[in-house]
């Protein structure tokens, strides 16, 4: 038997609600003045801001016997993301973009309720006060900042923002809101310069929470422990860490000797050891703090039998290892220097090299740019002027089929894969190459 909805639902199905404007507690100019006067990192929104950031909205609500609340909640549509149960009153509203209407009690929701339930409902208009506790992080930021930052990198309990210049006057408000609205976050920082140091660390400012920088996190089944201020770590590269480990596993054998020459705290080697059962790994990093964390992570993950750790210049280490070992693969994951580090591999054939590197060439020329620059390092031949060369030069070389064929002949394998866009006109790629005997090719190139 079909059920018909009571006529009262026709008045409220798909109802729209708007923020109530003109209320004294919504003096956002006063709120901005308080925000701009904030002078230190906080763990929550200051008390004198809380009432100014509360908003009253008009809603339609359902009044129903308490016994039916669970039934109604089960049928609640996705748009009703804020659900409050107070006594026998059920309020549902979706918080939407500022100044726009939002849907409450969609037709689909009302139609999905059994008639025995709908007959016991009473729907009426009401108002609902949303305090900062009930509002989202982004909606709070939008009240104060015209174009607020919406995303950050999460590193354990640390939220890492890259704030633009226009956001800096609001940084302590951003930090306080992030700490309060993100339960897992207790420390909020913003980077204040680019990665320029020898060890790829950078300067930052604490803008929210407490200055606690020792991190412990689990990623793809591997536990990492490190001090975020002293080593390089980018959570956005987690997919690439696993992808590279999978690629290496598909390329060589688990008992082959592999050197991770710029390993940081060890993500590639630890994944190879624990996920793919590699047994003969050498890890090296020049940063003493990264080396300390690397040894700790090897111990935490019980990989001591598979990984040997070094703390020295990778070129010196290679000069020692190449004549003494049967090295099968090398990983260079320091993008600014990876291609330069290939110089240590000159004249060494039949070893796979896995590089992470940058290019400013557009996607259709990236392969040729990376081929030219890798060849310059490996062949000791100045074919072109490198990463700062004019794109027109790369285009000319890309059109020179004879030269490209000569370069490709130097390699048994030369593959490139885009990893991510770092910034405008700056891209990160993975290069996989294996060197052939090169003597004849070098002679031709030097003519």
Curated annotation (Swiss-Prot):
GO terms for biological process: tRNA methylation. S-adenosyl-L-methionine binds at residues 241, 285-286, 313-314. GO terms for cellular component: mitochondrial matrix; nucleus. The keyword Methyltransferase applies. It holds the Pfam family TRM5-TYW2_MTfase. GO terms for molecular function: tRNA (guanine(37)-N1)-methyltransferase activity. Keywords: Cytoplasm, Methyltransferase, Mitochondrion, Nucleus, S-adenosyl-L-methionine, Transferase, tRNA processing. Monomer. HAMAP family: TRM5 (MF_03152). This is tRNA (guanine(37)-N(1))-methyltransferase.
